[in-house]
Amino acid sequence: MKASKYILPTEKENPSDAVVASHRLMIRAGLARKSSAGLYFYLPLGLKILQKIKQIIREEMNKTGALEFDLPILTPSDFWEQSGRWTAMGKEMFRIKDRHDLSYALGPTHEESFSFLLKPLLKSYKDLPLNVYQIQTKFRDEIRPRFGVIRSREFIMKDAYSFHIDDVSLDETYQSMRAAYRKIFDRCGLKTIPVQADSGSMGGSASEEFMVVSPIGEETLLLCNSCGYSSNSEKTPLVLKKENVSSASVEKKEISTPGKKTIVEVSAFLGIPESTTIKAATLKSEKKKILVYLRGDLELNLHKLHSLLRIVDSEPMTDAEIRELGLVPGFIAPVAPNDKVKVLYDRSLQKDFPYVVASNKEDFHTQGFVLEKEVSGLPEFADVALAREGDLCPNCNAPLKAEKGIEVGHIFKLGEKYTKAFGIQVLDQNGKARTLTMGCYGIGVNRTMATVIEQRNDEKGIFWPISIAPFEVTLVSITKGEEQYSKAEEFYNVLKNENLEVFWDDRDVGPGFKLKDSELIGFPIRVTIGKKFFENGEISIYNRKADKEESFVFAGFENLIARVESLRQELFAELE
């Protein structure tokens, strides 16, 4: 491909609204342009990268025996009503109506559609296991699109779904897909960590996210360097160090705390550790009001709470709603379970410890409050607090380390949630009808592209892994006149005829401009022929990842091809 015949709108300046490297460099390198909030145009260079990522995904999926499909993006509301997710998906799902007043969703995921499609096609255990996938545009009505294509409203996803006669078969495919995902991300040049995760509205039992450690990550990962445990903080069980709770006064008495509503204010006013206090969180869902008590130095983990109560979402109660329960906003004392509100106590609390708690009276707290003495019918304690760095590993009790991460893939064991909803059954070996069990496996294609940039950039620009670079080799020629141009074209044709992906920068611009563009875009290998070549036969080969250039006297095309191919193989070997 010749640059003179290509769209190559590189930019010197960073876009004003870009706050992360991938967003800045995708725009500056001419890979994409913004359409509107969370929507992007992909230009030829960017599209080539996406196509290569898709091809790697396709190859590894096909190796597992998965079959590729293509389903409609527009999905009838009936499918979502049948699974119970028309409401559960919340405001992030785009919903539209046609001229006949029929409702549809722009598919954010396709469990329902594949279930509807495959129900009449699967009749016997002999048809199983079946693993199906597609690579398709999805939609999510993000309230705040950010970080370029990392969190956008329209995105490309590989979504796969597997159907099984039993959990043993599901686990075999789950492990096969787990291995395939590691291979996909390795081939894309990404270092990923599989972490235990919350299944959310997808449902099911086991769930793992493939995370890339990055300071811009929106997820918090908790990792154990001792045993290798890894988990999203949303999922991590809280295991506290015993010394987290210090001694406190045993005498029970009410104390004045004028204007002190928060735990920080109360503990500072009384000169006590936050860990010796109890705080309350007041929430409501569509079906119930919820009152959660936890240790004052901890935060409520909404994902754990929602999973425990099997609710999709919750929001804070208003002061009026709190008062309806006979409680004083800002000064809520521990209460016993009752029929007005669902009461939960976090397992970080000790039943026999004398805590400082609110007195359910304006501007007063009580010290020496022992739960097992003061709260009748104390319920079983639940794990609903957020684990943090320094808390203990649930496997080996070593301290956990926190990292920020970007999710690029997610695999689930869905169980029978969708097969039951759609009545998907087959006859087993004994002729008995069996409800199938499912798995689900997703990869964000655009997000993978952007995350590679986050991991592989420097002050000059991007350095793509050779597997997904828009072109493997760029030929930069600095010529004067027809004769020199023709010689450069000979180099281009020879390289191209060796089945190398070559991008020839034959534009009539200065040498500095060409060299900087090649480094900004991130072509893995650069061959430069310029003034030194036409004077004394000297050419150079540049390794973008190593930022290293080697100059040598041209000794024929066979020698040049050997040098380029050697570097090419070296760069591919790094991805294995």
Swiss-Prot record:
Keywords: Aminoacyl-tRNA synthetase, ATP-binding, Cytoplasm, Ligase, Nucleotide-binding, Protein biosynthesis
The organism's place on the tree of life at top rank: Bacteria
GO biological process: prolyl-tRNA aminoacylation
EC numbers for this chain: 6.1.1.15
One GO cellular component term: cytosol
Gene Ontology terms, MF aspect: aminoacyl-tRNA deacylase activity; ATP binding; proline-tRNA ligase activity
InterPro entries: aa-tRNA-synt_IIb (IPR002314), aa-tRNA-synth_II (IPR006195), aa-tRNA-synth_II/BPL/LPL (IPR045864), Anticodon-bd (IPR004154), Anticodon-bd_dom_sf (IPR036621), Pro-tRNA-ligase_IIa (IPR002316), Pro-tRNA-synth_IIa_bac-type (IPR004500), Pro-tRNA-Synthase_IIa_type1 (IPR023717)
Main location: cytoplasm
Swiss-Prot/TrEMBL catalytic activity: tRNA(Pro) + L-proline + ATP = L-prolyl-tRNA(Pro) + AMP + diphosphate
Keyword Aminoacyl-tRNA synthetase found: yes
CDD domains, sorted: ProRS-INS (cd04334), ProRS_anticodon_short (cd00861), ProRS_core_prok (cd00779)
Annotated Pfam families: HGTP_anticodon (PF03129), tRNA-synt_2b (PF00587), tRNA_edit (PF04073)
Similarity field: Belongs to the class-II aminoacyl-tRNA synthetase family. ProS type 1 subfamily.
Domain commentary: Consists of three domains: the N-terminal catalytic domain, the editing domain and the C-terminal anticodon-binding domain.
Complexes and interactors: Homodimer.
Purpose: Catalyzes the attachment of proline to tRNA(Pro) in a two-step reaction: proline is first activated by ATP to form Pro-AMP and then transferred to the acceptor end of tRNA(Pro). As ProRS can inadvertently accommodate and process non-cognate amino acids such as alanine and cysteine, to avoid such errors it has two additional distinct editing activities against alanine. One activity is designated as 'pretransfer' editing and involves the tRNA(Pro)-independent hydrolysis of activated Ala-AMP.
Entry protein name: Proline--tRNA ligase
Organism expressing this protein natively: Leptospira borgpetersenii serovar Hardjo-bovis (strain L550)
Lineage start: Bacteria, Pseudomonadati, Spirochaetota, Spirochaetia, Leptospirales
